Regions:
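Compositionally biased, intrinsically disordered low-complexity regions
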Residues: 5, 58-61, 129
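Post-HExxH zinc-binding segment in Zn-dependent metallohydrolases
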Residues: 1-10
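Amphipathic alpha-helical substructures
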Residues: 12-15, 22-100, 104
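Edge beta-strands of extracellular beta-sandwich domains
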Residues: 154-162
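Beta-strand-rich binding/interaction modules
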Residues: 45, 79-80, 99-153
Length: 162
């Protein structure tokens, strides 16, 4: 499905000018929602959020901001930068990773200012959640770093520098 995403323009077009967003909105939106599900780290909590959102906003006219705030509250994570990145820009963030013998440094690039979003990494075949920002952070390992990749369920790109 990601191969069909052109990232030609933001999902949310400009308001008040009768101009729609990207034709990618369904495929890209699907990937964004799936990534959000991963961020919840618990399928039951994610589905409970969707049910609560349906109940809360039943038969109302709402805005994207209403949904974004609701999901942030239910997840316990400030996702404002996440939504700004994925809904209001066409770009997919890139996790820049610099490997060392016993760990790695990482930060988000090709993203909005002060972007932050958790991401699940596979480090020596073990799942590890990290919370990158646009500033460098580090993760040290006790054993030698043999294998490193991003979980494919996270909708982002990764660039590893040896």
């Amino acid at each position: 499905m990601r191969k069909r995403i052109g990232n030609d323009k933001p999902i949310i077009g400009p308001y008040g000018v009768n101009k729609g967003g990207s034709g990618d909105m369904y495929n890209k939106g699907n990937n964004i929602i799936h990534y959000l599900k991963q961020i919840f780290k618990n399928d039951d909590a994610f589905y409970a959020c969707l049910r609560a959102m349906n109940k809360e906003f039943y038969h109302q006219t709402i805005t994207s901001a209403d949904i974004e705030q609701f999901i942030s509250e239910k997840s316990g994570i400030n996702l404002s930068k996440f939504f700004d990145q994925y809904l209001r820009t066409k770009d997919i963030p890139v996790l820049l990773v610099k490997k060392s013998k016993k760990g790695f440094r990482y930060k988000w690039t090709e993203c909005i200012e002060n972007y932050e979003a958790p991401v699940k990494m596979l480090v020596n075949n073990h799942a590890v959640w990290i919370s990158p920002t646009t500033s460098w952070k580090s993760l040290r390992q006790k054993e030698k770093l043999a294998d490193l990749s991003m979980d494919q369920n996270c909708y982002a790109e990764i660039k590893i520098i040896e």
